Regions:
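Asp-based, Mg2+/Mn2+-dependent phosphohydrolase catalytic module
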Residues: 1, 109, 113-209
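Hydrophobic residues in well-ordered beta-strands that form the structural core
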Residues: 14, 103-105, 180
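Short beta->alpha linker loops
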Residues: 43, 47, 83-87, 107, ...
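Short, acidic loop-to-helix structural element flanking the phosphoryl-transfer center
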Residues: 76-103, 109-114, 141
Length: 209
């Protein structure tokens, strides 16, 4: 394995509370009750407009407005209660000494990089790629393939770590291996998995994968 590329939400960081709060503010702005938390958590990892479309009968205009309201509130609150999962910082420090590391997330890059830097992880990652940089949404493999290019590695030598079926499908389409963060927010839909991580502390096994 030449490189390990990570999703962010539900994989390295527990962003649940801040994301749910932003959803709550957005649905309040739309004038309708927010769906139950477990249903909101189930869409984390999708493009934001697609998240709202799930709950708004695919109404594009209202979904776009929901995404706008979400982003407006989240811009000032994305770090209120977001924290690394236990064991992540130690695992990243060890893995960075042996592998090229990067982040591939549907979170906007400006927030992803700010969060990475705020926890002192900037020097550990060769690149952090977010959703606003002209690439199609997961599971299209374009973002992952771009990171392979930046890291100067072939996809076959990459392990992608994520917590959703979209992550697994993106890795499959790119030709990369996949490690499923089962402690995160999502689930799998029969996609191939090379490693299953039951808890954040299990990230430490990736160095020997």
């Amino acid at each position: 394995m030449n490189a390990i590329i990570f999703d962010l939400d539900g994989t390295l960081l527990d962003t649940r509370d801040d994301i749910l709060a932003a959803f709550g503010k957005a649905f309040e702005g739309l004038g309708i009750p927010a769906p139950p938390p477990q249903k909101l958590v189930s869409v984390i990892g999708k493009r934001l407009e697609d998240c709202f479309a799930v709950f708004l009968d695919d109404d594009e205009a209202r979904s776009a407005e929901g995404a706008r309201l979400f982003r407006s509130w989240y811009a000032d609150h994305y770090r209120d209660r977001t924290r690394p999962y236990p064991g992540v910082e130690e695992a990243l420090a060890r893995l960075a000494s042996r592998h090229r590391l990067a982040v591939c997330t549907m979170k906007k890059g400006i927030y992803a990089r700010a969060l990475v830097d705020s926890f002192g992880w900037g020097p550990l990652f060769r690149s952090v790629l977010g959703s606003e940089e002209g690439f199609p949404a997961k599971p299209d493999p374009a973002m992952l393939l771009e990171l392979c290019r930046r890291l100067d590695v072939e996809p076959e030598g990459v392990l992608y770590v994520g917590d959703t079926s979209l992550d697994a499908e993106m890795a499959r389409r790119a030709g990369a291996s996949f490690a499923f963060a089962a402690y995160g927010y999502g689930s799998l839909e029969n996609q191939p998995v090379q490693v299953v991580l039951s808890s954040p502390e299990d990230l430490s096994v990736l160095g020997s994968t």
